[in-house]
A protein has these predicted regions:
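Solvent-exposed coil/turn segments that connect beta secondary-structure elements
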Residues: 67-69, 76-78, 86, 101, ...
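Soluble periplasmic/extracytoplasmic beta-strand elements of cell-envelope proteins
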Residues: 63, 70-76, 80, 110-114, ...
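Second-shell loop/turn segments in exported
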Residues: 34-41, 79-89, 123-127
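N-terminal targeting leaders that direct proteins to extracytoplasmic destinations
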Residues: 1-70, 190-196, 200-211
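Periplasmic peptidoglycan-binding/anchoring modules of Gram-negative envelope and division proteins
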Residues: 50-59, 63-65, 81-114, 185
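A broad, low-specificity signal for short, low-complexity segments enriched in glycine/proline
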Residues: 23-26, 32-37, 71-74, 110-114, ...
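Extracytoplasmic/secreted proteins, especially bacterial periplasmic and envelope-associated proteins
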Residues: 39-42, 46, 50, 91-98, ...
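Periplasmic OmpA-like peptidoglycan-binding domain that tethers envelope proteins to the cell wall
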Residues: 117-203, 207-210
Length: 211
């Protein structure tokens, strides 16, 4: 069985049904919607674990968090963009394409796009670079599918990788800086998945397959 790295849980946050997800912080969006029913949570955890394994078998770097309810896929920025560029390249497009089917059933997933940089350059530069890059990825999803329930975040160099030993990966080598330049895609269960889990079965057929 493939082993997935477990990330630390996020703080609890209660979201109103009419809350605008685009007005929420990253932590707030990661914490909601909250799943309070144990049986419902069990079904979602099982479904998400299977999805995570499928991504891992396709050679994506995968983690799970929030009691296995949220999937995190990390893609190196070097596989999405040419150096210092803000246009998604052909390799990046191929890596992003599998996520289009996650968006074909609005409300099944909330997808959070979180772009990071190393600390090369000023904080203003790194923030602007990550903002342009995450907006380019958001626009790519908009042009090729849908951006309903897709929320972009640009964090500059403020959130370096934390490794499996809970150590911060410092920007003190070429390899470490490369690790910190990354896109994190969080797949958070949303209302449609929660409704299916409440009824008893989460059915992948509700997400249309690519032709």
């Amino acid at each position: 069985m493939a082993v997935l790295f477990i990330m630390c849980p996020v703080s609890s946050f209660a979201r109103d049904d009419d809350e605008d997800i685009y007005e929420l912080s990253l932590d707030e969006n990661l914490a909601t919607p909250e799943i309070k029913n144990d049986k419902q949570a069990d079904r979602i955890q099982e479904f998400q674990y299977d999805m995570a394994i499928a991504f891992k078998k396709s050679n994506y770097a995968v983690e799970v968090m929030r009691d296995d309810e949220v999937i995190v896929i990390t893609i190196p920025a070097s596989q999405l963009f040419d150096p210092n560029d803000t246009v998604v390249n052909s390799v990046g497009e191929a890596l992003l394409k599998p996520f289009l089917r996650m968006l074909k059933n609005p409300g099944f997933y909330k997808m959070l796009l979180v772009m990071h940089s190393d600390n090369t350059g000023s904080s203003v530069y790194t923030l602007n670079l990550t903002r342009q890059r995450v907006n380019a990825i958001y626009d790519w999803f908009d042009e090729n599918g849908s951006v309903d329930y897709v929320v972009p975040y640009a964090l500059g160099d403020t959130d370096p990788v934390v490794d499996e030993n809970n150590n911060i990966v410092e920007n003190n080598s070429v390899e470490n800086r490369k690790r910190n330049r990354r896109l994190e895609i969080f797949l958070v269960p949303e209302k449609t998945m929660l409704q299916q889990a409440k009824k008893g079965t989460i059915n992948m057929s509700h997400i249309a397959k690519d032709k």
